Design a protein with these regions (language model features):
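Short secondary-structure junctions
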Residues: 39-42, 228-236, 284-291
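Residue-level signal for inorganic ion chemistry
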Residues: 15, 147, 259
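A common structural junction motif
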Residues: 70-72, 224-225, 277-288
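Acidic/His- and Gly-rich active-site-bordering loop/insert found
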Residues: 1-101, 106, 110-127
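Short Gly/Ser/Thr- and Asp/Glu-enriched loop/turn motifs at secondary-structure junctions
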Residues: 47-51, 234, 252-254
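A conserved active-site cap/scaffold subdomain adjacent to cofactor or substrate pockets
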Residues: 248-274, 291
Length: 292
C-alpha cells in the first residue's frame, strides 16, 4: 500500500476541495465509480440517488460489504491548505451556501478506494465476494434507506458482514478504535414548525408569540436526557436551527426549529421521539395554541 500513498493523497485532496451536499453528490459519486471500476469491480451507479454499488466475486466464500459515505456539509471552510474547499452552491431551500467536508467523508472515501485497491491486488489471498457501496446523504440520515428501498439487498449479494469506519481526531494517527456494541449513534433529523399569532412587537398582548414558545420548547427538550432517561444512557438532542422573524419590532407567526437526535438503541430512540412530540403538544396547549 505504500506505493499507493501518493495517488491516495492526491485523491483525498481532490475530494476535500470539491464537496457536494446530500443527494447532490453527482461528481463525487462518478469519481468513486470510476476509481473502483478500474479495479475490475462490476459497478452500478445511481442506486438510491447517487449511491454506488460495486461487486467483485472471487470464488466461493463469505460476502463482505464495505461502505463509505459521500456527502459534505453546508459549512464554510476557514483554512490555508492548498486544497481548501471554496465550493459554493444552493441548498434545497434555494439559499447560497458554502460546502465543506467537515465530517471526514473525504477521508472515508479515500480509505474505501485504498481498501478496494489492496483487496483487488491480493485476490490470491482471499475468497468470497466483496460489495463496496458508496452511500449518499449520510448527513441527512436518509441515504442508507434510499439505497435499501432501491433494492440494495435484493439486486446485489446480501452481505454476511458489513464494515465501515469513521475518522476520529481524538485518536492518534495509525490508531484504530474498536468496541463491543454500538460504536456510534444513530441519527434522526426532526423539524418542528411552531405556529403562533403574529403582530406588533410593542403590543405582544395581541399576539401568540411563537419565539417565546419555541424558546420554551428548546429548553424543555434538554430535560428529556437529564430527567426522563437512565443517567448512563447516551443521548444527544441538539437544536441546530432556530429561524423566525423578519424585523426587530414584528412578532412573527411562525418559527422553524431543526433538531438532530442521536441514540444508541431502538427503545431509547422511540422514547426520545415520543417525548419530543409530547413536549411540543403540551407547551402548545400551555401557550393557548392547542392545535399548533
Amino acid at each position: 500500500m505504500e506505493s499507493q500513498r501518493p495517488s491516495l493523497i492526491q485523491l483525498y485532496e481532490h475530494l476535500h476541495a470539491t464537496p457536494e451536499l446530500s443527494f447532490h453528490e453527482k461528481k463525487t459519486s462518478a469519481r468513486m465509480a470510476q476509481e473502483i471500476r478500474a479495479l475490475g469491480f462490476e459497478v452500478t451507479e445511481k442506486v438510491g440517488g447517487f449511491g454506488v454499488v460495486a461487486v467483485l466475486k472471487n470464488g466461493p466464500g463469505k460476502t463482505v460489504l464495505v461502505r463509505t459515505d459521500l456527502d459534505g456539509l453546508p459549512v464554510r471552510e476557514i483554512g490555508s491548505v492548498p486544497y481548501v474547499s471554496q465550493t459554493t452552491t444552493k441548498d434545497d431551500a434555494g439559499n447560497d451556501v458554502s460546502v465543506m467536508h467537515a465530517c471526514g467523508h473525504d477521508m472515508h472515501m479515500t480509505c474505501w478506494v485504498g481498501a478496494a485497491r489492496a483487496l483487488a491486488a491480493s485476490k490470491d489471498k482471499w475468497k468470497g465476494t466483496l460489495v463496496f457501496i458508496a452511500q449518499p446523504a449520510e448527513e441527512r440520515g436518509m441515504g442508507a434507506l434510499a439505497m435499501i428501498d432501491d433494492g440494495l439487498y435484493k439486486r446485489f449479494p446480501k452481505p454476511d458482514v458489513c464494515l465501515a469506519l469513521h475518522c476520529d481526531a481524538g485518536l492518534a494517527v495509525g490508531t484504530f478504535g474498536v468496541t463491543s456494541g454500538p460504536a456510534t449513534a444513530s441519527t434522526d433529523t426532526v423539524d418542528i414548525l411552531v405556529h403562533g399569532v403574529g403582530g406588533h412587537g410593542a403590543m405582544p398582548n395581541t399576539t401568540k408569540d411563537p419565539i417565546v414558545l419555541a424558546s420554551q420548547i428548546v429548553l424543555a427538550l434538554q430535560t428529556i436526557d437529564s430527567r426522563e432517561l437512565h443517567p448512563v444512557e447516551p443521548v444527544v438532542i441538539t437544536v441546530g436551527k432556530f429561524n423566525g422573524g423578519t424585523k426587530h419590532n414584528i412578532i412573527p407567526d411562525k418559527v422553524e426549529l431543526g433538531l438532530t437526535v442521536r441514540t444508541t438503541s431502538a427503545e431509547t430512540r422511540e422514547k426520545v421521539l415520543e417525548s419530543i412530540k409530547r413536549i411540543c403538544r403540551g407547551l402548545g396547549i400551555a401557550a393557548g395554541l392547542p392545535n399548533h
